[in-house]
Amino acid sequence: MSTVVHRQTLEVRESVNEPDYDTSIWLINAEIPEWPKRHWVKPIVGDEIEQKPQEAKDAADAEYLKEQKQSRINQLREQYNEALDSRYETRTLLYASYLLTKAMASMEEETVEYLSGLAQWVEDGDVLVEAAEGLVESSTTVEDAQAVSLTLTSWLAADPKVSTRAARKL
């Protein structure tokens, strides 16, 4: 079994059929270094995988950290959105917002008070997500960014359980 590495894409494969690989495209029997692939010089020239200079490694690490932070932020937002969707459909939230605006314009205090609870609850959830995002953004390592969690148990328990049908009847 041979390890082959694509010289342009840095794809690594284990293969038993070395003759199937063109040596101008693939590095055959490559010794895979212990450093991350983002530190490899691309394209591979010659018979060895070379490491980028420190400045290029630092830039690659900074870009990697940025990507990992954004990925974690996206995961946290998805977690929040799934939790919100588990309680209210998007159309219900939009309709509740419309009813709240309409009630405010016509000074229907009871309806405003009822629907404001939902608006405040959604805002409270947004605050939790934004706080977690802030922790991710201030992280200096990938491990720190990935360690940030979002606990929505108390927030979900505080759901005002608003019904647009009930709001229309007020």
Regions found by a protein language model. Give the residues of each.
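A preference for well-ordered globular domain cores
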Residues: 1-3, 7-38, 42-170
